[in-house]
Amino acid sequence: MAAARMLVLLASLCALLLTASAAKWTPAFATFYGGSDASGTMGGACGYGDLYGAGYGTRTAALSTALFNGGASCGACFTIACDTRKTQWCKPGTSITVTATNFCPPNYALSGDAGGWCNPPRRHFDMSQPAWETIAVYRAGIVPVNYRRVPCQRSGGIRFAVNGHSYFELVLVTNVGGSGAVAQMWIKGSGTGWMAMSRNWGANWQSNARLDGQALSFRVQADDGRVVTAADVAPAGWSFGATYTSSAQFY
């Protein structure tokens, strides 16, 4: 009985520690770009292209080197709040959750506190203007913020846009829920076993398997370690340039 109580106590303690970790806020800074309609945020270093079509809309941000992680953070979600203790330009009581869709490159010609906002090791979010104006006043230009990584809430299944050529497949993965960021991918043709893919750039994953004419399945591992499988999501007659929506998702 004592052992059982001890196990319950340990489980409760672990749950409290996990909750505390999930609630941790980290200081950073934020600016904005892309115009009032966010048209200048389309495309970007994650490869999502039309952010409306990809399902991300205007709630997006470009991440500094310290956060972008060479593209491994593409698709991750962050809740950002302006730090009212450090600036008068916040909109008090507000926060917004954004998706990482782009890279904010360093500018080594300027110091980190005078224009080189995204220089390492600074944690910085260059937000879309509509997202920024949810939490801060336009004229401020830059504000101190606090952020935390949060689960991504997505509608529908993970989507796979198959590009490339007959000798390789370049697959753009979008609409990933849960962690949001893809750490590893595998591809399988209807006549093959599972084969590991490699990150080409951003959210684009490459295979040199020559799978023309075979139905395609994908296995996705998020950066929290969870794995889902999208079986036969692209039929045997799939074509380059098409996007295929699966029923698989990190719920």
Curated annotation (Swiss-Prot):
**Protease listed as a keyword:** no
Q: Which domain of life is it from?
A: Eukaryota
Tissue expression as described in the entry? Expressed in roots.
Main localisation: secreted
Task: Tell me which GO cellular component terms the UniProt record holds.
Answer: extracellular region; membrane
Matching CDD domains: DPBB_EXPA_N
User: Is the keyword Disulfide bond assigned to this protein?
Assistant: yes
What the entry lists under PANTHER family is as follows: EXPANSIN-A15
Family statement drawn from the similarity comment of this UniProt entry: Belongs to the expansin family. Expansin A subfamily.
Supply the name of the protein: Expansin-A8
